[in-house]
Amino acid sequence: MTKIKICGITRESETEMLNRMQVDYAGFVFFEKSKRNVSIEQAKEIKKHLKPSIKTVAVTVNPALDLIDEIIEAGFDILQIHKMQEFHENLKIPVWVAYQVRNREEAEEINVPDGISGILLDAPEYGSGKTFSWQDFPMKKRREWQERRIPFILAGGLSSENVEEGIRLFEPDVVDVSSSVEGEHGKDYKKVEAFVRKVREHE
């Protein structure tokens, strides 16, 4: 069964819909240039209201070790790293490494380090609402990760309109959505509900 991650949680009120819909992961962004950026303290307060069954993901961009230590101390379940410069082994937290897919050539050069807990594929531009070119992606890479039993997270431009196609093509372990389920004031209940329904209808 494909699991669901709702990313970019910024308000306590959003936890109610995640709890009600029994999603699997809630993502909190720790990157100042993002409009969804929150502080560690804000995230700690918000995540108190999530059901224990919902795992929390700390989303970062090439984080300093000090930030990683804060994330671990705050009790997050998973560390997600974009633009990783160096993979630090022996971190006391599972790590998802995110790669932006710009073209087929770059995708073919993705080398996933040993010891990570998941690989996430994202669009060339964060939060653009656009997918990377699914049809151009070298599926031999996907099969390689399956053989290595590395959990795979599909992100970047997913919506209730295209998530079924993404699941059919990639057979991801997790689908990750953010911008397409937002309204004027954060996450929109009906949009989140529509996305969750499409994922579960596909099973």
Regions found by a protein language model. Give the residues of each.
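Conserved N-terminal beta1-alpha1 strand-loop-helix module at the mouth
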Residues: 1-203
